[in-house]
């Protein structure tokens, strides 16, 4: 029976847009997708959304290293991420970016409401500054020893060992990740969110019983140690949204990142021309359900800051957080050197998506436990469960139905009571899917698969097929096997979308949860084709080797204009205004005796002549070709005495040097002596 339809909004944590999706990411997205697909099968209205987390200094610096703009980098990463998720059949309704108009507007709205309600405080702080790079260091670009648990090599905003959050200035023996230098202290005005004002509300939310026990217990520890005001601003240079009425100050990435859930949903509503659903889902008294699937490393932000921000800006809070653990491979942390740090795209070159979806699902529960991807066990389990128990059930019976009965199933069930046992299991299996006890659901389904295969073994259709006058028995036995297979695949449909499509094509019928009580009787199925292939350890070995090769390729140095010559330290407008750039006509150009690099240029500034030595000879072997051409020069550079004479300025050129030097020229119409601004 179809349940009362609910309105549900589901999100996954936003992948950071500076790297590829790997198997650690995929645990969460598979877990959420299985749950979402089950909810859709039960008739609920589900909106499943995600986005790239696209702001912060790490993105700014990596784009600089790659020689591209941050916008270009996050655009490329978004396409890569979406391709990976589509490859794993993650059924998002919308995938957006935090670097969007929707997210900017919502971030400014929430900030403004918090400020108007008195929850934003200003104060001057002492901040770590990299004296070598000339920039304030964001949290993730300082490493040191955690001030709480004393674990070494921890980032400046939170400890990955004990989960504590703190200020970078609290780190013991901090070092700049950018240069390795020891940071110095500098003062800067920052904006703070008054988290302690929400302590009572957050404790009540914790005690509501909705959160996982492990999450609630951890939150209680944080309450007992006392909540602190949260620094939500960062200084330029920074890639993100500038804070309204605060030039040079930007929203910290963790302020606008969770707002990205709202921004992605707003974008989806706008695409649909839906003007009501956004408010319906996000208003303070909304009766829609909101669930965030997240990893245990970001519980602090989602269980404290996020609900407090929503409460303070008059939006609804999450219905629940569904928190999972980490992924290990072969019992250890994923390793690039061992080839177990595996990208999603690499996996799909060696295995199908359903195989990993099944293995993760079989190991997941509602607890925050780490999941180990044991690659040998993975091969054994996929072959034993999907191939031997489930798909084999169909192949053992379909051949007889196709060949002997033209694909038509029997008019009656051979064993109605056995069939009822299978359909009665829907309640237990459905509850397991609902409560995210995925491993339990798989165990229940595989136990039924064992029963179904025992039935076929006992009935032995291959023996019956050879006995005269038993065609009706043969049809009934095989039809029973196929109907049991159909029920099993209906239960597995949230997990195995690709296999389910093939099964639906064979059965000539959709796998519908609410239709399992009605078996397929006198129903024509299509010709059976192989549904799933066995896998082996040779594929695993190839996967691991490919991952190692990718690491080697990624280690190759990045080249490009910005990578080879990084942008210099930011200067003020007043500094720039001191440089006097002028259009100059090249009146004469000649070689310099005794130099294989220099040309002597005579420049006309429209009433004043200048003598300039320029190191452009390698790119302009015929100096006469430059005569009559206009260029741009620094006119107020102090004269420089050289052994060939005095150079009275500098002409502007681009390129890395050698033969790749390109003299700059103004557009037609510019006149000698005109200022370049």
From Swiss-Prot:
Q: What class of enzyme is it?
A: ligase
GO molecular-function term, one example from the UniProt record: ATP binding
Compartments where located: Cytoplasm
Q: How is the cofactor bound?
A: Binds 1 zinc ion per subunit.
Biological process (GO), any one: methionyl-tRNA aminoacylation
- Enumerate the spans annotated as tRNA-binding domain: 575-677
Q: GO cellular-component terms in the record?
A: cytosol
InterPro entries (alphabetical): aa-tRNA-synth_I_CS, Anticodon_Met, Met-tRNA-synth_bsu_C, Met-tRNA_ligase_1, Met-tRNA_synth, Methionyl/Leucyl_tRNA_Synth, MetRS_core, MetRS_Zn
Q: What is this enzyme's catalytic activity, as reactions?
A: tRNA(Met) + L-methionine + ATP = L-methionyl-tRNA(Met) + AMP + diphosphate
Kindly list the positions annotated as binding Zn(2+).
Answer: 146, 149, 159, 162
Q: Where is this motif: 'HIGH' region?
A: 15-25
Named cofactor requirement(s): Zn(2+)
Sequence motif 'KMSKS' region, residues: 333-337
Q: Which Gene3D superfamilies match?
A: HUPs, Isoleucyl-tRNA Synthetase, Domain 1, Methionyl-tRNA synthetase, Zn-domain, Nucleic acid-binding proteins
Family named by the database record = Belongs to the class-I aminoacyl-tRNA synthetase family. MetG type 1 subfamily.
Instruction: State the protein's name.
Output: Methionine--tRNA ligase
Organism listed in the record: Salmonella paratyphi C (strain RKS4594)
Record lineage = Bacteria, Pseudomonadati, Pseudomonadota, Gammaproteobacteria, Enterobacterales
């Amino acid at each position: 029976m179809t349940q009362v339809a609910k309105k549900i909004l589901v999100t996954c944590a936003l992948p950071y847009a500076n790297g590829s999706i790997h198997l650690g990411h995929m645990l969460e997205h598979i877990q959420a997708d299985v749950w979402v697909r089950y909810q859709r099968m039960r008739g609920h209205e589900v909106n499943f959304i995600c986005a790239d987390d696209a702001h912060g200094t790490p993105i700014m610096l990596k784009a600089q290293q790659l020689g591209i703009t941050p916008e270009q980098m996050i655009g490329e990463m978004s396409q890569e991420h979406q391709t990976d998720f589509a490859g794993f059949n993650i059924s998002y309704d919308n995938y957006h970016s935090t670097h969007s108009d929707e997210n900017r507007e919502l971030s400014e709205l929430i900030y403004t409401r918090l400020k108007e309600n008195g929850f934003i405080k200003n104060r001057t702080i002492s901040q770590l500054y990299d004296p070598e790079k000339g920039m304030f260091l964001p949290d993730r670009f300082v490493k040191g020893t955690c001030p709480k648990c004393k674990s070494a090599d921890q980032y400046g905003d939170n400890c990955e060992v004990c989960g504590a959050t703190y200020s970078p200035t609290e780190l013991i023996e901090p070092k700049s990740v950018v240069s390795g230098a020891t940071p110095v202290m500098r003062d800067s005005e920052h904006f703070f969110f008054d988290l302690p004002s929400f302590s009572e509300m957050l404790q009540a939310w914790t005690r509501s019983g909705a959160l996982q026990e492990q999450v609630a217990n951890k939150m209680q520890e944080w309450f007992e140690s006392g909540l602190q005001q949260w620094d939500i601003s960062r200084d330029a240079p920074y890639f993100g949204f500038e804070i309204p009425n605060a030039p040079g100050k930007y929203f910290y990435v963790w302020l606008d990142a969770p707002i990205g859930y709202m921004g992605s949903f707003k974008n989806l509503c706008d695409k649909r021309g839906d003007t009501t659903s956004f408010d319906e889902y996000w208003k303070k008294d909304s009766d829609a359900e909101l669930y965030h699937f997240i990893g245990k490393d970001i519980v602090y932000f989602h269980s404290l800051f996020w609900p407090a921000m929503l409460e303070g800006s008059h939006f609804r809070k999450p219905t629940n957080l569904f928190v999972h653990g980490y992924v290990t491979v072969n019992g250890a942390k994923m390793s690039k050197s061992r080839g177990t740090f595996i990208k999603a795209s690499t996996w799909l070159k060696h295995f199908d998506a359903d195989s990993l979806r099944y293995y993760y699902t079989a190991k997941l529960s509602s607890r925050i436990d780490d999941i180990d991807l044991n690659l040998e066990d993975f091969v054994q389990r996929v072959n034993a469960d999907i191939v031997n128990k489930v798909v084999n059930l169909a192949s053992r019976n379909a051949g007889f139905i196709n060949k002997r009965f033209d694909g038509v199933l029997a008019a009656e069930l051979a064993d109605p009571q056995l069939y009822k046992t299978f359909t009665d299991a829907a309640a237990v299996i459905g509850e397991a899917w609902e409560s995210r006890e995925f491993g339990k659901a798989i165990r229940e389904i595989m136990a039924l698969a064992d029963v179904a295969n025992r039935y076929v073994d006992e009935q032995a259709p291959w023996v019956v097929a050879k006995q005269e006058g038993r065609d009706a028995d043969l049809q009934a036995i095989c039809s029973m096997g196929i109907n049991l297979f159909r029920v099993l695949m209906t239960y597995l449909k949230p997990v195995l979308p690709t296999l389910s499509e093939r099964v639906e094509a064979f059965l000539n019928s959709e796998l519908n949860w609410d239709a399992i009580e009605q078996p397929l009787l006198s129903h024509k199925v299509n010709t059976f084709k192989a549904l799933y292939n066995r896998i082996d350890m040779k594929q695993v070995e190839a996967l691991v080797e490919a991952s190692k090769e990718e690491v080697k390729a990624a280690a190759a140095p990045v080249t490009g204009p910005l990578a080879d010559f990084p942008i210099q330290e930011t200067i003020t407008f007043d500094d720039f205004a001191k440089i006097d750039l002028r259009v100059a006509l090249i009146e004469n150009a000649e070689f310099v005796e005794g130099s294989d690099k220099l040309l002597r240029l005579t420049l006309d500034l429209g009433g004043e002549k200048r003598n300039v030595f320029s190191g452009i000879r390698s790119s302009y072997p015929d100096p006469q070709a430059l005569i009559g051409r206009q260029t741009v020069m620094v006119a107020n550079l102090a004269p420089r005495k050289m052994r060939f004479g005095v150079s009275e300025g500098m002409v502007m050129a681009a390129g890395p040097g050698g033969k790749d030097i390109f003299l700059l020229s103004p557009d037609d119409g510019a006149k000698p002596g005109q200022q370049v601004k």
